[in-house]
Amino acid sequence: MQALVHDPESPSSLRRAEVPDPVPAPDEALIAVAAASFNFLDLAYADTVHGVGAVPGEDAAGVVVTTAADGSGPPAGTRVASFAMGGALAGRRAVATADLGVVPDGIDLVTAAALPAAGVTALRAVRRLGTVLGRRVLVTGASGGVGRFAVQLAALAGAHVVAHVGSAPRGAGLRELGAAEVVTDLDGVAPVHGVVENVGGPLLTAAVTLLAEGGVALSVGQASGQPSTIDFEAERRHGGHRAVEVFTVDTGYAGFGGDIEELLGLVAAGRLDPQIGWRGSWDRAVEAAEALRARKVAGKAVVEIGTV
């Protein structure tokens, strides 16, 4: 089958190649991939996450062509969206059935491919904040894939969302997604109950100081590539009643399929916008990757792989 493989010597470390079809494990279904989307992890940490020749990508949507040998999961012919580490940017993908969500009628597979990794990450992060109804929630990196989902999902849960972006142009459209405030600086921002922090570095440090008593800041990502310094002695003197957590989407992992279907349901109901900022053939995958890396994509970049 054709696939995009990791090659550090190629532009954006991506090269089109012929690779063997994946062989599914007993609990995995084989899907014909129609579309896949890029995530920051696929690009920023490609050289450490993927070996040379490996197929990257976490998100793919397509049609089941071979059901799981153990009898789990949807039957052949079912349209699905999938979330797993690696293997998305190819004509075929083997995925554990627990990580498949059935795509409802009326949602195209390009839209479905934009949801899994960023959407599930945002959904689980907002849940971790607990009850946010009527509370203030700060989302940093709000113009990115996870950020745009977090803004929408926190707003849907009743939060007063403060969206932080790196520049005023990056904030375009965020109020329409549910942000009550869009800021480029945290100076003057009132205290918040929770933080979905996607940038890291000094921004995480500053965000922690905004937490109200009992609040929590979730370190979801480090798009800045910079380390963060937290003054724990200052926190003790503050009272120690606020927390900073390293957040990972697979904490308490029990399969991603249910969350994918929840997100798809919100899209079908017109309550969630997948925010696809780039869409095109996978022949243009390098273009998509470079635009995403340069922060020129508002939201998700999706490549169309096959017609299924």
Show where each model-derived region lies:
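Glycine-rich beta-strand-centered segment in the early N-terminal region that forms part
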Residues: 20-37, 45-87, 198
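NAD(P)H dinucleotide-binding glycine-rich loop of Rossmann-like/cofactor-binding domains
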Residues: 44, 80-141
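Short glycine-centered segments of the SAM/dcSAM-binding site in methyltransferase folds
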Residues: 79, 136, 160, 215-216, ...
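Mid-domain Rossmann-like dinucleotide-binding core that forms the NAD(H)/NADP(H) cofactor-binding site
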Residues: 115-185
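A short acidic, Gly/Pro-enriched loop at the edge of an enzyme's catalytic core
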Residues: 188-195
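Glycine-rich phosphate-binding loop and adjacent beta-alpha segment
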Residues: 202-271, 305-308
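C-terminal capping/lid region of NAD(P)-dependent oxidoreductase domains
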Residues: 271-276, 286-308
